[in-house]
Amino acid sequence: MKTAYAALAAGLSALALSGPAQAQVEVQWWHSMTGGLNEWVNDLARQFNESQKDYKVVPTFKGNYDESMTAAVAAFRAGNAPHILQVFEVGTATMMSAKGAIKPVGEVMKQSGVAFDPKAYVPAVSGYYTAPNGEMLSFPFNSSTTIFYYNKDAFKAAGLNPDKAPTTWPEVTLAAAKLKAAGYKCPYTTSWMSWVHLESFSTWHNTLFATQNNGFGGASARLAFNSPLHLRHFENLANMSKQGLFVYKGRASVAIPSFVSGECAMFTGSSGSYADVSKGAKFAYGLAPLPYYQDVPGAPQNTVIGGASLWVMSGKKPAEYKGVAKFFSFISTPEVQSASHKRTGYLPVTTASYKLTEESGFYKQNPGTDVAVTQMIRKVTDKSRGIRLGNYVQIRAIEDEELEQVWNGKKTAKEALDAIVTRGNEQLERFQKANKS
């Protein structure tokens, strides 16, 4: 008995000397990923949590991008915002203007003493999320761009070369006509109408989407996409729609299942849709660069970034910011970046991760998976760097509303584009007035 008491006393003494076990620092991460991408986000957090014992990242789905931003604003006002918020690319200007609500990622990394080199990131990606003073504001995460998908089996059935995707928009029209003649009721569709056919279309053709270098030059930017080139493209799409060669399926990513199921033979959308296509398509498919108009000088240039970045909210403790910095460092390693790129189709946002993926033989084994990267690693121009406009969530809704009038035959392409520019500029004027320094 004495021996047992002695052992117990010794144990308690040792426990007292060692002190209480240090609790893990929790880092709350709000995101908008669904389906397989939600699993990917959870896996990243789990891998980081298992790699060390000091920090625990807790991912939470907060609805689509609009909903998560709204929830974050409410949470910030209530004093319980997350540490990390995933924000889609068109919310960049809005987040930049949210003075006091965010902490620049460059500042977070520096103050936490965690190595961080903005030059390691693909310029077209890092440039989008960088302030005029050169400081990176948010952390590139699920960066994507617009690409062309096509059903090789459908091409073969229509007498088209399954190994040769259309490279120009006139070729897309001709391919669509052959597919329709072969019995396909949906030869071509698209997701993200404004991103693909207005934003990326503009940068791909090295033509202005808005003045002030698409908003990068200042808040006085105004929309400029009712140009002859944009009008030509939308008149062509309107004619394709009337002939049943282009079928509008809906806003945002609604059209993806129509391609994956085999209903639609050609599809333009996010490189991030590769995860859905590779998992669900029961046919041979191909990936190719976005089509363009061959007679436009400077085309093709580069497509515009999509997806989202991770913003760090203000008002947290230094220890928590260090956890954020450590997590960002972990998910930006070449190995983690490369694995994420292969799994999702999102861009490898660092040059090192792209090279690692290339050296692994992935692109040779999966032809076309490098298309998104090659479209983005080109040197950008002032016209093709990206889009940075305030109130752009509202402007995108206006774009969808007006263009839907074209697809249902109620407006001409010119009427719709002019209306978007007029209504959109009203939103830009409001944003400019609300954010005068």
Annotate the PLM regions:
Residues 32, 197-200, 207, 231-323:
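Extracytoplasmic/periplasmic substrate-binding proteins
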Residues 88-147, 173, 199-203, 286-289, ...:
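Hinge/lid segment of periplasmic solute-binding proteins
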Residues 130-141, 146, 156, 170-222, ...:
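Extracytoplasmic/periplasmic solute-binding protein
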Residues 47-121, 157-167, 258, 265-266, ...:
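Extracytoplasmic "Venus flytrap"/periplasmic binding protein-like
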Residues 94-95, 99, 110-111, 272-283, ...:
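C-terminal lobe and pocket-closing loops
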Residues 156, 162, 183, 375-437:
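Conserved C-terminal helix/tail region of periplasmic/extracytoplasmic solute-binding proteins
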Residues 74, 82-83, 114-154, 186, ...:
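A structural signal for short loop-to-beta-strand junctions that line the ligand-binding cleft
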Residues 173-179, 216-249:
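Glycine-centered hinge/linker elements that transmit conformational signals in sensory
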